[in-house]
Amino acid sequence: MLKDKFNRTIKYLRISLTESCNLQCFYCRPNQDKTFTSCQSYLTPDEMLLITRVFSELGVSHVRLSGGEPLLKKDICLLVKEISRLSGINDVSLTTNGILLKKFAPSLKNAGLHRLNISLDSITPSKFKEITGGGDLKKVLQGIDASLKYGLTPIKLNMVVMRGINDDEIIPMIKFCLKKRLILRLLEFMPIGNSSSDVKERHMPAKEIREKVAQHFPLEKSTLRGPGPASYEYVKGDGLLIGFIHAVSQHFCKTCNRVRLLSSGKLHLCLGHEDQVDLAAVIRTPGVSIEDLKETIQAAVWSKPSVHRFNKS
């Protein structure tokens, strides 16, 4: 079992397969930042599988594949297939912007992917294009339909709520999810890659987001508790699940159960800190053993920070 010094059990590994993305969302890549880790520095698929297997042997049971945009990763379906076969891994999910989903949905299903999260901040074509730096909403909608067709369910839509930008689309997004029978997760805008003034101006606390929802839809608490940080409520009468993620206004650090493996092979212990441990350097060292890798991971997790620093941004 993998524990840190605050007695939190780590069960969830998030793997960033690539830094590359086919969108340019202004809050994710500010100032048109297109600087990526060189391809030569990426973990190979075999290295990713090795590290993931060791995490599974240490007690991790949930793996989420993300990016950048993970569907840009060569052999993505093979990776899904191999990870889903690992002993101890009972949940393999993927977070995508949906642009390529129409193409990949059947292959992902056949590879053993359990479920999908799709990032979607607007269902208005012009606003979607503005937020994403030129993205085509139609492709995402086609990807959602293809995923439903091939049974990649449940599908969760992740909407980052930004005051003055897309907070007027919360209710239309709920209606869209009701129609498609999707789970909606409403996320607070987080200070990642943004100046503090941007965050202060755009941030809408989850409490305020919930109040806006409750003005239009009656809500009741759900007992659902997934591996992630969302607190869920039902829309009464319709059964739609809405998750509220309050990463800034009411952090969930005491129950944090995850770490992130970057495409470079560095283990990132907390999004709100810069601390990293280079696992690629470990596994590429001649003569290193699996036990050496396990000990490195255990020592890294033990040093995981108690809380993030978002509120100081």
Predicted regions and their residues:
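Auxiliary Fe-S-binding modules of radical SAM enzymes
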Residues: 1-12, 175, 179, 189-313
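Residue-level recognition of specific faces of alpha-helices
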Residues: 9, 14, 27, 51, ...
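Radical SAM/AdoMet-radical enzyme domain recognition
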Residues: 42-65, 72-187
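A short, compositionally biased micro-patch
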Residues: 18-20, 111, 236, 262
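Glycine-centered loop/turn positions within well-structured domains
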Residues: 23, 125-126, 251, 277
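Residues that scaffold the ATP/ADP-binding catalytic core of kinase and kinase-like folds
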Residues: 24, 28, 73, 126, ...
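A short acidic, helix-capping loop that chelates divalent metal ions and anchors anionic groups
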Residues: 33-38, 124-131, 193-197, 278-280
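Canonical Radical SAM [4Fe-4S] cluster-binding loop centered on the CxxxCxxC motif
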Residues: 6-44, 271
